[in-house]
């Protein structure tokens, strides 16, 4: 903070001492007020419309750091984001410092870079029970059936040094997922999501083709092979 000098990049280090290491460790560091502040804290106030800048470090079970990124953190999910342990999305962007997570996060996927990962709390149905039922279902069919499935790995999570429980790291189901898995032109994706309202939320593209398909299905018989 010396006068007439440019500030340097913030350096973040995580030290997990004398804690069980039977799971990989995910350490998230942020300015406390951006997560838990009474006025601007996205976690305390359950704000889903804004990201908080964070540093994220993943340590494998052998203690070696797998990756470190400066990224954005936002609340995700629907009803489950009201739980004490909230679902979170970590998304890289140049404005935070890193554009990708340069690491093969999931052993059963061929990808070595990710722009986002999803920290799932096992959802409304399973957060307070097994914590892995949804992930187990995806693991059973992944690379075995012609179905969309999200890779998963559990991690012991710390936020600002405080243990935050087990999260399931999942592939983020978004337009980047579709590009990576299917080679789709990112400018030719309509990605819609329903969240407790009759009209879809447009995350990418628009609703024209979707509603045209709905109209076709409602006005034409699917018993006719040509349809």
Q: What spans do the regions from the language model cover?
A:
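Phosphate-handling architecture centered on phosphoinositide signaling
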Residues: 1-227
């Amino acid at each position: 903070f010396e006068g007439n000098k440019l500030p340097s990049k913030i350096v973040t280090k995580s030290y997990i001492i004398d804690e069980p290491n039977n799971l990989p460790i995910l350490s998230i560091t942020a300015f406390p007020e951006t997560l838990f502040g009474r006025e601007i804290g996205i976690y305390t106030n359950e704000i889903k419309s804004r990201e908080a800048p964070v540093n994220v470090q993943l340590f494998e079970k052998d203690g070696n750091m797998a990756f470190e990124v400066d990224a954005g953190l936002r609340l995700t999910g629907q009803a489950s984001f009201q739980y004490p342990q909230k679902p979170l999305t970590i998304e890289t962007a140049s404005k935070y410092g890193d554009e990708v997570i340069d690491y093969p996060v999931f052993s059963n996927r061929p990808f070595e870079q990710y722009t986002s990962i999803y920290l799932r709390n096992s959802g409304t149905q399973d957060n307070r029970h097994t914590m892995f039922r949804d992930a187990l279902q995806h693991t059973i069919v992944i690379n075995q059936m012609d179905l969309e499935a999200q890779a998963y790995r559990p991690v012991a999570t710390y936020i600002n040094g405080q243990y935050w429980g087990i999260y399931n790291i999942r592939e983020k189901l978004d337009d980047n997922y579709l590009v990576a898995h299917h080679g789709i032109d990112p400018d030719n994706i309509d990605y819609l999501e329903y969240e407790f309202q009759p009209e879809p939320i447009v995350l990418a593209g628009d609703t024209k083709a979707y509603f045209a398909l709905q109209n076709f299905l409602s006005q034409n018989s699917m018993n006719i092979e040509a349809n």
